[in-house]
A protein has these predicted regions:
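Short, acidic, Ser/Thr-enriched surface-loop or helix-capping motifs
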Residues: 147
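Short linear motifs in exposed loops
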Residues: 141, 154-156
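Conserved functional hotspot residues or short segments at active or partner-binding sites
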Residues: 153, 169-170, 174-193
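Short acidic, Pro/Gly- and aromatic-enriched capping/linker segments at domain boundaries
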Residues: 132-134, 138-143
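Cleft-lining beta-strand/loop regions that shape enzyme active-site pockets
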Residues: 1-5, 9-123, 127-130
Length: 193
């Protein structure tokens, strides 16, 4: 059984999509049968980046949408005709925020991965920064985002499918262990079918 762990630690930035696609392609060439994607402590990043990554994993269809206070809706949909069909687990925690929650929420809505860990942060808003003439800037909210099934994450977060606490004094990563056990169980079932 060959499963691998992929960490997206820092944030979803402009280069993350190509790095992700390249890593997934390399792992598939190696014959992986399961994948753990670790977005614990990932504060988020660029909405388009996470949408492009999800487009590579999910079937064609709605990935995420944003809605302004006035009701204007913008949809991000999958269209690249690529879908990753291996058992997956996504690790999250209370420091998984914003784009990380979009990722986890979409994977959960499409039932593409088991979400494992603790409740995510709950930052379901899109913000922008406007520079001021004195050199300072103002950051303000322009929209809320929603998962494909319309889940509003703001102030609530994403609830994992399997809640697994990771105590500060833990000597092993029990969340990662739970993900590997989940994948081993999924692969045993598919091998028996």
């Amino acid at each position: 059984r060959r499963q691998r762990q992929m960490c997206i630690r820092d944030r979803f930035d402009d280069v993350t999509t190509e790095q992700f696609k390249s890593a997934v392609d390399d792992l598939q060439k190696q014959g992986i049968t399961g994948l753990v994607i670790d977005i614990r402590n990932n504060p988020g990043g660029v909405l388009k980046t996470v949408a492009d990554m999800l487009d590579y994993i999910l079937p064609n269809g709605l990935i995420v949408y944003t809605e302004t206070k006035s009701g204007k809706r913008q949809e991000y949909s999958g269209s690249d005709n690529h879908e990753l069909n291996i058992p997956m687990a996504v690790l999250v925690n209370g420091n998984s925020a914003s784009a990380s929650e979009i990722f986890a929420g979409a994977m959960q809505d499409y039932d593409k991965a088991q979400i494992i860990g603790t409740q995510t942060f709950g930052k379901g808003i899109v913000q922008t920064i406007r520079p001021l003439t004195d050199g300072s800037a103002v950051k303000y909210t322009i929209a809320k985002y929603f998962t494909p099934k319309g889940q509003d994450i703001h102030g609530k977060g994403v609830t994992p499918d399997s809640i697994v606490e990771l105590p500060d004094d833990a000597t092993e990563d029990v969340q990662l262990k739970a993900a590997v056990e989940y994948l081993n169980g999924k692969m045993s079932v598919s091998a028996a079918e």
